[in-house]
């Protein structure tokens, strides 16, 4: 199931559809207002039934998949399991405090503490059982008016239930800001051409640390510096310089531009003498005209036409 909020839920449905393209069957559940993660979980009670389940927050990107963690939880009698990751700024996250005498035990969990003595962030992946629904029913809204997942986990522990934790290996990124999305893009692209490369579709080729989609045409009068990904049915015309750290979506046309450390989503057209850096260009956008040689940084929404 995918839980949809009140910000453009139709865009999520438009992208994933019924899930057939991804080999799954998707049920959509609506959370009309942002009342907290625990509130969103409670909306899934009927969908979950008596099964164990995983809650995965959509703005999380992990280097390692969840297979090993899922097997560990499924074969156990745990009431919950959380994943932890060491961070430099714990005040931005829910933070777990482990027992000094027994590091396998969690003492408590606090949401966005101001002065934390722990650097173990609770990442947005929660392994739960239906016991959590009864816990959520007894929660009170936090100071920001939401039913917090950290409060639910703390109450679950307070009632004597068993919560385990595991530490994430590899990187983890919370993509809550444009800067975070750009950084996550760099982390993903760094896997190209390595043993740890993310899976790509069968009709996509990989050359060194550059991935090029099918039916994409690249002019000889252009240059690509990896790591980079170029989608299907793209046209990279003359005078284009791409990379490093560039992701280009399907159906894009680029001409006479330079793009570095940026994400350009599908069906975009850039035919401007512009030097883009650290930018995110949403799908079906168009940039044309002429700019100076200085570096430009843009954050453009869908179907934007920017004339320079």
Predicted ranges, named:
Residues 59, 86, 177:
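Active-site glycine-centered loops adjacent to acidic/histidine catalytic or metal-binding residues
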Residues 7, 130-131, 179:
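Alpha-helix/helix-capping structural signal
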Residues 138-308:
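Left-handed beta-helix
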Residues 62-143:
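Conserved core of the sugar-phosphate nucleotidyltransferase
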Residues 12-16, 136, 184:
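Hydrophobic packing residues within well-ordered alpha-helices of enzyme cores
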Residues 25-27, 105, 162-164:
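Conserved beta-strand segments of alpha/beta enzyme cores
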Residues 1-57, 61, 66-68, 75, ...:
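Conserved N-terminal catalytic core of the sugar/cofactor nucleotidyltransferase
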Residues 1-6, 83-84, 263, 280:
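Short internal beta-strands
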């Amino acid at each position: 199931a995918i839980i949809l909020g009140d910000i453009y839920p139709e865009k999520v449905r438009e992208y994933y559809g019924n899930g057939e393209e991804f080999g799954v069957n998707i049920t959509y559940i609506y959370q009309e207002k942002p009342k907290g993660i625990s509130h969103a979980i409670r909306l899934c009670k009927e969908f979950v039934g008596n099964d164990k389940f995983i809650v995965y927050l959509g703005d999380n990107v992990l280097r390692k998949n969840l297979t090993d963690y899922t097997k560990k939880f499924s074969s156990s009698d745990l009431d919950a399991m959380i994943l932890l990751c060491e961070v430099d700024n714990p005040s931005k996250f829910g933070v777990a405090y482990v027992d000094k005498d027994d590091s396998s035990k969690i003492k408590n969990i606090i949401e966005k503490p101001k002065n934390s003595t722990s650097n173990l962030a609770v990442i947005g992946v929660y392994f739960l059982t239906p016991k959590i629904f009864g816990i959520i029913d007894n929660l009170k809204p936090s100071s920001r008016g939401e039913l917090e997942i950290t409060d639910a986990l703390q109450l679950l522990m307070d009632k004597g239930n068993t919560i385990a934790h595991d530490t994430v290996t590899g990187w983890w990124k919370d993509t809550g800001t444009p800067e975070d999305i750009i950084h996550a893009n760099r982390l993903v692209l760094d896997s190209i051409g390595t043993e740890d490369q993310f899976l790509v579709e069968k009709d996509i080729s990989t050359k060194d640390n550059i991935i090029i989609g099918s039916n994409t045409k690249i002019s000889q009068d252009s240059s690509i510096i990896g790591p980079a990904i170029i989608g299907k049915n793209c046209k990279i015309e003359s005078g284009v310089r791409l990379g490093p750290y560039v992701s280009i979506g399907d159906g894009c046309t680029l001409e006479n531009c330079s793009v570095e450390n940026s994400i350009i989503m599908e069906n975009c057209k850039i035919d401007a003498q512009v030097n883009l850096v650290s930018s995110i260009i949403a799908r079906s956008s168009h940039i044309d005209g002429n700019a100076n040689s200085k570096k430009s940084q843009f954050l453009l929404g869908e179907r934007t036409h920017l004339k320079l």
